[in-house]
Amino acid sequence: GNKFAMQALEKGCAYAVVDDSSFLTPHSSLILVDNVLDTLQQLARYHREQLDIPFVGITGTNGKTTTKELVATVLSKKYRVHYTQGNFNNHIGVPLTLLSIKPDCEIAVVEMGASHPGDIEELVNVAVPNFGLITNVGKAHLQGFGSFEGVKKTKGELYDYLQEHSGTVFLNVDNPDLFKMVDDRPGINPITYGVKHQEVEVLPVTAHDPYLRIKIGGVVVNTHLVG
């Protein structure tokens, strides 16, 4: 990316950050740092810490992007919501998502992906979520994690962060892996959902009414989602 710094300035950027001194010129708008990626993440965390609003972190083996879109859509009916665009969910996409949050935002929904152990730990320390949701933990894409246990440990880094910071998780109690992961981490505040023994109940669908319905505190919410 260093080689494109001058091109970016010529196209109107106010400043360009580089981490290779050989690209420096007398141009006063070039800023030299030790590591551009680290600087991006540090700037993103600083910006996030200026925002006293709820941050929802979402990860999981499958369904991250769909879940993020659904959560953001529902919340936007009442709040000004900023959320990850597309699947910008990695070590570059998450900081860019945070840096694009405007001061009038009321809730942020941040998708976080992982392909290796430690990825989620890195991202939560940038995004600083106070709410979290793991959609599931599966055996897809095992190559980067080494084993299913590696997947659970990596996704569980979101729970680890929320445990350490007294955060809240939205927990599918019908998923035994997720249930145990939360149960093994005392101090997390879970809000449960599922088809039984939960605070938010997913109601059965029928052939003549195949749309997803949920029950919250005695109130039934009808959706246009096919269950």
Name each region found by the language model.
Residues 20, 35, 90, 175, ...:
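Intrinsic-disorder/low-complexity, polar/charged segments
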Residues 22-23, 48, 114, 207, ...:
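Short polar/acidic secondary-structure junctions
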Residues 28, 148-149, 184-227:
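Adenine nucleotide phosphate-binding catalytic loops in nucleotide-utilizing enzymes
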Residues 32, 38-173, 177-186, 217:
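Phosphate-binding loop of NTP-binding sites
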